[in-house]
Amino acid sequence: MSRKSCTFVRSNGRVAMNVEINQQRIDYLLSLYKMTRDDLLTQLNENRSRGYSLSDINGKMMAFSLLKNIDKIFQVGVEYYLDFSAISPKKSSSIFFRKTKFGSNLNMEAKRRVQSFEMLKSELDAYWKLSDISIPKLSVHLTIQDDPYQSALKVRELFYPRNVAKKDRDFLKEFINKLAEQYIYVFEFVETWNKKELANIDGAFIGPNMIVLKRQKSFKREIFTLAHELGHCLLREEEIEALDLPSMAAGGSLTAVEKWCNDFAFCFLMGDKLSEFDLIEHADDTNDYERDRIDYFSSATHVSRLALYTRLVMAHKMSNAHYQLVRADLDAQYQRMINADIEQMEKKGGASPQPIISNFYKDTLCCALYNGIINEAKFCKELRVKPDEMYKYFA
């Protein structure tokens, strides 16, 4: 419920607007992001000649210009602070209240991204509830006591795409929509190449049925992340993380859950090629690091060459020294690809690619529109379609 009470004051010859805000909502965000009001004040006063004070942010009434600056930090929309409905930091409201430690040290942008998808998920759940439709719960439930390799092979029929595409992006799209058949939301977000702060995560699983993916220059990396997060989903183990293959190769410490999900993802994607891959005895300079066979497996399974070499190191079939040489070469190839993409985007004006939209998300919005819960403008905006193209979703 929004009161939208406001006053106008004259300051330094200018008329400024003050608005009544719900301080409880600022407290909620500070709790969510593990910040204090002093932390908030420090961020607000960065690069400012005249700083704000605690009294400026603690009052019932707040300068609208200050409120907009606060929202530049949290990015939830100004209307959020003008809403006086009750809100409290409960475990049911956010993964940040259910977990205190994550697989990565999350930066502010990573937290903002995850929170935005949590807010979206709450909307989608409300659409189904208002439509009086219950979404079936996932039928598969695994534990880390289950063998990850055997488990991956068993669930492939449910979650692996039927029509295997050759191109990595097409495969990723089919993979996302295969999960949609099991009522799992997959949301992909795309960051612009020239953005000031980038989210330092690759993916996240937020229970009970939402996976978030960061668009990567390498779709193979994104595919592996999706398979990894599917493992979290089947274990019912929430996580927000960046996947670090070199650290795995170096024997970096992993939790039992992370190791299980990595093994699950690798086996899930390799499928019947796994036994053939296991026949590789060693990879070093005497056999050109098995480049031809690695290229073959990577092309056939959508598993990156780096992930395949990482597995060889973990299986003691490749030395860490040889791995670092190969990795340096792969990193150089990857960087050249990124530089070429940036150069191309600069020539085209910097247009960003669009995220893949899950069929489950489309179905949710179609249901909401059909039942009068959202309007046509909202439908077209979310799916990025023109009004005269809406009929395609209801054919």
List each model region and its residues.
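Active-site hotspot residues in diverse enzymes, especially metal/ion-binding acidic/histidine motifs
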Residues: 2-395
